[in-house]
């Protein structure tokens, strides 16, 4: 699979100076942690879940979480588990019929995706790559039980999302993951969710963070990314951010995000990928504040119509939050609505200017440091201080691609939405 693989090769060529690379569920963890992008959540109770997964894959989704936790009623868990087993079996059967190799998406499947007109087939047809699939569980015992019940269709599974993660609670989840992995003979990743009230409370935050750091470091090779449960953070204080506001406007939430990145997101080799919080809103009738999207990027062609649609669906706030996520050290985003996926991916593409700066900073012969003027003649690049930024930028460029010099996020967003 690849980002923007759902659009035609001709369209990709027109958008990208360097196209997104292909990857599979068996790619290195470092690559997959960056490639997660917009991770779309879906309740595990949906009766046509296999069809839903393939439909979203055909729209550009590359990672999904099938939820057995907060998105379903307590009384639905048993039926939801049974539904998951059926839906994974259906996905595995379709995958076998297409000649692919499950979540690994064999090279042959990627070759099909590069054939004009076959970037993705109709849901259920050959040629549709299954996204990276994760199951969000409630209790550690569900991990081993589900892996056992999945049988051969476990090959469609990339891992588990671990809720309300702390050192004590997380240890049991990670031990269960290790046991399940040994039983099925397949690599399984963990994505812990940091959302407990103890993490939010100032008097316990430091020790909770240090405990989480100890826990995930012990299982570093299996922790793909850390996710933030901002809705739970707000709940602890009876708060809910409005669609005109980002998570960073809620200071108590912004402070815990900063501390999580401080301890767990360092660029010195000890850190992890930390994903952005969920955006809760779709569309509403009335707004209090002025729209946050400037007109200037939307002046050509039908772009003004796109701007209007984004504002009507409350996605201008989402776009701002995505930019603030990256400015604060987060990458990717939890999504609960398909309309949120394209904006996340469009803003994850590396601009030609960013790419040029990063390559200049990391170019051979620059190891001794120094200062150089950007090729765009609009900024100073310091080799040593900007090195970690440049390395992360090139990692993002590998999986999301580099836009052509005259291509902006509006072009990328429009392409993602119309294909």
Spans of model-derived segments:
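Expand to "…catalyze enediolate/carbanion chemistry for C-C bond making/breaking, isomerization
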Residues: 1-419
